[in-house]
Amino acid sequence: MSTSEVARLKQQIELEYIAAERGLNGFAAGAAKHEFITARMENIGRCHEQLKTLVGENEAIKALAQALEQAGSEAAQ
């Protein structure tokens, strides 16, 4: 397991979540907003899949939850 790769993926999940949150509350409307947010969520899914191959399913779920919690805290500030 590459600790730096796991950290990179968690950081990417945080960034994608924050981008989706901003897209939800931003000025875009309609289909463009939906497509933007969908793309961010799909990217999070890809990161989660990569985490599963690195650390296994249970640890990947924990890492995803930690990243989303951290991103939620940052987005709220």
Q: PLM features: what roles do these ranges have?
A:
Residues 2, 73-75:
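A charge-rich, low-complexity, intrinsically flexible signal that marks solvent-exposed coils, linkers
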Residues 27-37:
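Short, surface-exposed loop/turn segments at secondary-structure junctions
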Residues 66-72:
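Short A/G/S/P-biased low-complexity tracts
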